[in-house]
From Swiss-Prot:
The gene is ctaB. Interacts with CtaA. This is Protoheme IX farnesyltransferase. GO terms for biological process: heme O biosynthetic process. Carbon 2 of the heme B porphyrin ring is defined according to the Fischer nomenclature. Gene3D superfamilies: UbiA prenyltransferase. Its EC number is 2.5.1.141. It is a multi-pass membrane protein. It comes from Dinoroseobacter shibae (strain DSM 16493 / NCIMB 14021 / DFL 12). It catalyses: heme b + (2E,6E)-farnesyl diphosphate + H2O = Fe(II)-heme o + diphosphate.
Length: 315
């Protein structure tokens, strides 16, 4: 636990607006969850009624929002310390901790039950596990206890495309596993790049990020190693029926750029990084978001083109 002077049980006088309660759901994170889940659902080799697909994505989004609310409730004591998170609704006093907890628990139950009714029990079970893993295993345990928090905890963010696939097909396949693995392996370089230029925030909050426990030099090496391990996963998807030339070309370009970025980070020393205010690290972090989005966009584009009859590869 952090030494921050924040009590989750304390009453707060501020009345939150709709925007404050919506912010509890972490809409930016939710948008990535929704998109990757949508891709997982649409690239699946089955015919799905549009209403079933809509309901599946809606309830996956609700589940993601529930996870965000539970995370904000639990992390309020460290969020109040970190500049990047101090303005969140709970530490800012706009929403009471108990309200965030109630919203998170309520939406968790609703999303799991409704996804089971709309699709199948396996998809609902995966959603329930994802919420539990993020809110309990990652937020309450891993995040504050080990520098491997992001490595293990990254599984929570990697499940959405698998849930989308299972919602459509009712089973797990190699394609679903590789989409999961793509996000899972991408997560450490993405967040460690952030930690390179936000080290002081994590240190002050008592979060044992790799930069805090092992230093920036070790973190740079870890970023390069995990990026190298990420490349075959990304390219491996091109060998499955859901991908084709478009995805392969996209993946080759993106991974070449990503590898170059990781190499540039590894070569830098702290004097260089401080001199340009971590410009290379910030650029790598921003590109990592585009990297993931474009991989899934390429998968989605191939699925749409194939089903429309305009594309003869993949699918």
């Amino acid at each position: 636990m952090s030494d921050a002077s924040f009590d989750r049980s304390m009453p707060l006088s501020g009345e939150g607006s709709f925007g404050d309660y919506f912010a509890l759901l972490k809409p930016r994170v939710m948008s990535l969850v929704v998109f990757t889940a949508l891709v997982g659902l649409l690239v699946a080799p089955v015919s799905l009624h549009p209403m079933v697909g809509f309901c599946a994505i809606l309830f996956i989004a609700v589940g993601a929002g529930a996870s965000g609310a539970l995370n904000m409730w639990w992390d309020a004591d460290i969020d109040v310390i970190m500049k990047r998170t101090a303005g969140r609704p709970v530490p800012a006093g706009k929403v009471q901790p108990g309200e965030a907890l109630a919203l998170g628990l309520g939406l968790s139950g609703l999303s799991v039950v409704m996804l089971a009714l709309a699709t199948n029990l396996l998809a609902a079970g995966l959603l329930a596990f994802t919420i539990f893993f993020y809110a309990v295993v990652y937020s309450m345990w891993l995040k504050r206890s080990t520098p491997q928090n992001i490595v293990i905890g990254g599984a929570a963010g990697a499940f959405p495309p698998m849930i989308g696939w299972v919602a459509a097909t009712g089973s797990v396949s190699l394609e679903a596993v590789l989409m999961f693995a793509l996000i899972f392996m991408w997560t450490p370089p993405h967040f460690w790049a952030l930690a390179l230029f936000m080290k002081s925030d994590y240190h002050d909050a008592g979060v044992p990020m790799l930069t805090v426990t092992h230093g920036r030099k070790s973190t740079r090496t870890h970023i390069l190693v995990y990026t190298v391990l990420l490349v075959p996963v990304a390219l491996g998807l091109a060998l499955t029926p859901v991908a084709g030339p478009l995805y392969l070309a996209t993946a080759l370009v993106l991974n070449a750029i990503f590898l170059k970025g990781a190499w540039d980070i590894w070569r830098r020393d702290e004097a260089q990084a401080e001199a340009d205010k971590y410009a290379t690290e910030k650029r790598f972090f921003k590109f990592s978001l585009l990297y993931l989005a474009l991989h899934f966009t390429a998968l989605l584009a191939e699925a749409i083109l194939t089903r429309s009859g305009l594309w003869t590869f993949g699918g």
